[in-house]
């Protein structure tokens, strides 16, 4: 269905309580004094006065109430408590100037406020002697010609299918096609490429995978219906990830990790000059979206000293019941069997079960003693993994392919996965409230920072030796489509949730404003 002309919906309905006498003057004063702070004197005043009125700190995403003089931490919910007790539902974030509505539970957009914010930002930049991060767009001759031939502007409606496009299978390349579908429907990645944010610094842009992905996004969202032929993408993947070269069937999960790695390496120059305190920190779009932090706590069984390490991750690989992993806790009444070289387990396993198994303490045993820094000797220990930092997009890899010296098989155990997922119980901050790895329902229903929504599912049909990959993609909130190479068909939510599941892609429901 083509896009059609529509009237855009109104913004936040709760702004009326703020837009009263002299509201523009008051808002300009807030931006000048507490957000942009163009002069050195204003910056000193901001550093001195902008602290949380509850805890006295200024590092926890400080917000200012728009209805009264109150500064509060967003991370520690001090501004939330103020909003609830005073019924002051609007606040401004003091780092980037976003307006947050506590009734909408999200940052909101208002054209009038945006104009004031941009004007005050430009004034501050001028006082500081700096320019805008991105220059004003000037259309090329080719773009001017295109604009002449396309004078009407189209807006995407809830029934629009722009962005859905089939991909030609170039010879056992379904593993690549399903991952491309998931990446091109990742909201923040789509916004990055469609806003022309990539700045290629490679000597040969034709060998840059990020440039090719940018072209791919343009193809997907051009409105064309015919299947796209991703021959150049395949060539670049073969060039930069030699282990994937050739026309034999490959693992979709392996392709995902290889593609993210190449994109990460080719994104040099896209961080817009941002510098982190950690020189090893990368701020490219791939790391911003997909990188999380996995905390590993090793506890000595003698002195109970804890050694903690934090490692980055792009995906979370989860064991399944029916694998050769000896410590999988089968639920009462479950039975396992092997049929035609494939492992099956009766009963229903959930994604939460797999995450509970992933984050429970594991006794390392006497054969894996570590040298304890407290005891200064080798001792038995336990190891527990938790999430220190969650990525914007969480990819869960269900380990269905088992390779060992004795056997090679596919595990077809059905795993039930939800449309919405709360990762709070598996956070490092929730570890103390979880006894011996037992799952506990989070008590803070207002904590939305760790909540995710499903937007893509990759499935594998067939056996380990011969199979085929397809994917389900969420186009709008409740519209799903099945992508089978060049064929795109509409799917129901039941179709998605009843599928076997190999790779599950979840997107954060609420994002920090930046």
Swiss-Prot record:
Residue positions binding Zn(2+) 1:
12, 14, 101, 104
Residues bound to Zn(2+) 2 are 52, 55, 73, 78
Under catalytic activity, the entry for this protein gives:
Thiol-dependent hydrolysis of ester, thioester, amide, peptide and isopeptide bonds formed by the C-terminal Gly of ubiquitin (a 76-residue protein attached to proteins as an intracellular targeting signal)
The protein in question is named Ubiquitin carboxyl-terminal hydrolase 22
Q: Where does Zn(2+) 3 bind?
A: 65, 68, 82, 88
The record's active-site residues are 174 (nucleophile), 468 (proton acceptor)
Show where the USP domain sits.
165-509
GO MF annotations for this entry? cysteine-type deubiquitinase activity; zinc ion binding
Location of Phosphoserine modifications: 226
Q: What is its EC number?
A: 3.4.19.12
Q: Its gene?
A: USP22
Q: How does it assemble?
A: Component of some SAGA transcription coactivator-HAT complexes, at least composed of ATXN7, ATXN7L3, ENY2, GCN5L2, SUPT3H, TAF10, TRRAP and USP22. Within the SAGA complex, ATXN7L3, ENY2 and USP22 form a subcomplex required for histone deubiquitination. Interacts directly with ATXN7L3; leading to its recruitment to the SAGA complex. Interacts with ATXN7L3 and weakly with ATXN7L3B. Interacts with MED1.
Where does this protein reside within or beyond the cell? Nucleus; Cytoplasm
Report the source organism. Bos taurus
């Amino acid at each position: 269905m083509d896009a059609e002309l529509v009237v855009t919906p109104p913004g936040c309905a709760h702004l009326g309580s703020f837009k009263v006498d002299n509201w523009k003057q008051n808002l300009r004063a807030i931006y000048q004094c507490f957000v942009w702070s163009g002069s050195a004197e204003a910056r000193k005043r901001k550093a001195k006065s902008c602290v949380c009125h509850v805890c006295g700190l200024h590092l926890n995403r400080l917000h200012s109430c728009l209805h009264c003089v109150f500064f509060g931490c967003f991370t520690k919910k001090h501004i939330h408590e103020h909003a609830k007790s005073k019924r002051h539902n609007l606040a401004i974030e003091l780092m980037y100037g976003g307006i947050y509505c506590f009734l909408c539970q999200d940052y909101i957009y208002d054209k009038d406020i945006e104009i004031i914010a941009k004007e005050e930002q430009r004034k501050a930049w001028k006082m500081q002697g700096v320019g805008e991060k991105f220059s004003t767009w000037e259309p090329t001759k080719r773009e001017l010609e295109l604009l002449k031939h396309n004078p009407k502007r189209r807006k995407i409606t809830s029934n629009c299918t722009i962005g859905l496009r089939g991909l030609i299978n170039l010879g056992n390349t379904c593993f690549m096609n399903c991952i491309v579908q998931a990446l091109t429907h990742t909201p923040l990645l789509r916004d990055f490429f469609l806003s022309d944010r990539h700045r290629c610094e490679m000597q040969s842009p034709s060998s840059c995978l990020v440039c090719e992905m940018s072209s791919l996004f343009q193809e997907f969202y051009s409105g064309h219906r015919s299947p796209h032929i991703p021959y150049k993408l395949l060539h670049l993947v073969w060039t930069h990830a030699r282990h994937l070269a050739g026309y034999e069937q490959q693992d979709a999960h392996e392709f995902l990790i290889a593609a993210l790695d190449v994109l990460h390496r080719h994104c040099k120059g896209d961080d817009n000059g941002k510098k982190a305190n950690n020189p090893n920190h990368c701020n490219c779009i791939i790391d911003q979206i997909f990188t999380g932090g996995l905390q590993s706590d090793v506890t000595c069984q003698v002195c109970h000293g804890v050694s903690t390490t934090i490692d980055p991750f792009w995906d979370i690989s989860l064991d399944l019941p029916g694998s050769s992993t000896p410590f999988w806790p089968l639920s009462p009444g479950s039975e396992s069997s092997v049929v035609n070289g494939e492992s099956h387990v009766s009963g229903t396993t959930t994604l939460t079960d797999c995450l509970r198994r992933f984050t429970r303490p594991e006794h390392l045993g006497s054969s894996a003693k570590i040298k304890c820094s407290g005891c200064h000797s080798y001792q038995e220990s336990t190891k527990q993994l938790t999430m220190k930092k969650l990525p914007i997009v969480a990819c869960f890899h269900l380990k269905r392919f088992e390779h060992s010296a004795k056997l090679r098989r596919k595990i077809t155990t059905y795993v039930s996965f939800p449309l919405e997922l709360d990762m709070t119980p598996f956070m490092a901050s929730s570890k103390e409230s979880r006894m011996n790895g037992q799952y506990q329902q989070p008590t803070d229903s207002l904590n939305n920072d760790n909540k995710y929504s499903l937007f893509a599912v990759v499935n594998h049909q067939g056996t380990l030796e011969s199979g085929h990959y397809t994917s389900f993609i969420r186009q709008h909130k409740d519209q799903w489509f099945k992508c089978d190479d060049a064929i795109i068909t509409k799917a129901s939510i039941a179709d998605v949730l009843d599928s076997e599941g190999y790779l599950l892609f979840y997107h954060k429901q609420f994002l920090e404003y930046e």
